């Protein structure tokens, strides 16, 4: 990417979006409305692949949910951390993730959503209830307020918060993972050297309103299928003609 970086124009962003749309289509994914599930899924996804993440989440369901019912997060919080650790072992670094999951649940149970009325489970000495362990209030709350709340939870950053808001409720936020970051940087969408957390603000600023899901999913797909980390397939890239980084990897073995 050239040193003299300039914020991409709307026309350039739309050309990239349209070309990605030609290759990958428009993803269809209705918001699932389960923000706490999404939050825990994102924790489980850290340092592993989608398959291992999904197996770990399924194991959590088997341990802490009655068939056909949602996960009992109050029971998960009350359980010994070793039970959570055993359940999520297929997802890797289970000791770290199990402690983080319980810390997040404890924080939700013990803190109030911004502007919310008193929550029974948050009272001193009162065990958390299903209602206390809920993020449903975010459905109608200002996005910035919900994002700030999520990012204050233990181990939760902008990407995790964006996953919860976008995938659970379809709210205007956009996760920037390693694939989106890599593709966006090579295309010149991001300021070179920008801190990872800052990329979310840059991504939101350039994404056409209402197209957050499409842009995230298609950039991610392109990163996985073509714009690989070490050996991107530039010769086969649908975006090659509009990529300032094309040819930069030709000399690599």
Question: How would you describe each model-predicted region?
Answer:
Residues 2-252:
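Catalytic cores of DNA base-excision repair glycosylases
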